């Protein structure tokens, strides 16, 4: 399963805990058996629990790269946006990165989600199932012919 996690925002929604320097996704707020984990650590752990072989790439800004590497192992892929341009350009750049750098085929499914969802492992299990179904080619391609 190829997953792109979007982590480019400054995360000011948890102000005053988060700000431009300390984004919300890196603040350790979730209690675990060993202490606390951040949003990015939680979502990465959940993905790997569901699919240990999942290829995770985080689309982010250069200011967040060190925080990502400090909180996750270095095997996580990082696609650095040259400048912030919101969601669609981040997805376009990250999918180009998967294709051009990681060698992901044009026919392979890619799951895109935010780095900070508060979901159970069932969510990622469902995404894995959907990714597998899409990979089998049984999905109906989207057609926009009715708009012309």
Regions found by a protein language model. Name each.
Residues 115-129:
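Acidic donor-binding/catalytic loop of UDP-sugar-dependent glycosyltransferases
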Residues 133-137:
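Conserved donor NDP-sugar-binding/catalytic core segment of glycosyltransferases
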Residues 117, 139-143:
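Internal, well-ordered alpha/beta segment that forms a basic, Gly-enriched binding/recognition surface
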Residues 106-115:
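Short beta-strand-to-loop acidic/aromatic patch adjacent to the donor-nucleotide binding site
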Residues 1-69, 74-85, 124-125:
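N-terminal glycine-rich phosphate-binding loop and ensuing alpha1 helix
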Residues 145-148:
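Conserved small/polar residues in nucleotide/adenosyl-binding loops
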Residues 40, 94, 116:
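Residue-level signal for inorganic ion chemistry
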Residues 73-105:
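Short phosphate-binding loop-to-helix
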